[in-house]
Amino acid sequence: MDDAVGERLERLNSMLKRRGIILPAFEIHGGAAGLYDFGPLGGRLRNRVQQVWLDHWLSQGDITELSCPTITPYSVLEASGHVGEFSDFMTTCDACEEGFRADTLLEEYHSNPDSLSKEELAQELAKYSPPCPNCKESEWGDVSAQNLMFNTRIGSGKSGRDGFIRPETAQGMFTNFQSLYRHFRQRLPFGAVQVGKGYRNEISPRQGMIRLREFNMAELEYFIDPEVEIKHDFSPWKGKEIRLVPDNSEEVMMSIPAALESGIIRHATVAWYMARTADLLENLGIDLERLRFRQHEGTEMAHYASDCWDAEVHASYGWVECVGIAHRGCYDLSAHEQ
């Protein structure tokens, strides 16, 4: 990021604070990285965005809303794979002993450092020796995985259980599948949405509101029968080209129906939700010239996904992920059933 962009962001952050939109949390006690308050205007703006999101998806007709606890038993997130897999690779500066995400240190040297393995990250750090964001030295320790969930204890004494503060809202929707199935009279497809808080113990929160330790999430889970074809109506998007970045390929401008027909997008329901997401973002004021859908490389795919596309918006920090659309297959339901 050049100096001019940095100065503009400083002025923006100052304005957001001055006008009561975004405020550093617990500032009179020194604050805490990755925690922010929504002020009087910020809270109203957030609520309006959330309501637009809810109205957009609930209007589809086969989607309902849930609200699940943020405190989650250990067994739930063990079954989902989060206990073993929900982690980022970190390294520590030998000079100042601050920890950082290894991939973020390499963003200026590699086109997609999030796709690198632990060994590859270590090799790239040794090759480029990026400066420490804190002290500017270039002495890095070993790369290791750190789980991102906040631990807690549910209850006290002998009857207490280990648990976590949820890292995503999705698991409550999966564990309620049978109730949802009955609600929809035992007919697929159907979906559920949930708006609420998510919590991740980020290694190095940065970029203002982009990477936080407590944040607002809005998730939709849509359940289909893989043996029954759904006839999605793509006619509204046939002439509407959008920027796509397929796995290991060059960026292309193509309509979502054309990308589905050509096999770039592998599943019709994934394509449907990409198109509907583009409509939502445009309705919220995002310039489609600044929007792209990027497919995850195999090495960066979440443990539960067989395919994933991120909706990214080009901003002062570069391309910023704002929506993830993943084909989770039967992973979650099978995991909880076992």
Residue ranges and their predicted role:
Residues 2-338:
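TRNA-recognition modules of translation machinery and tRNA-sensing kinases, especially anticodon-binding
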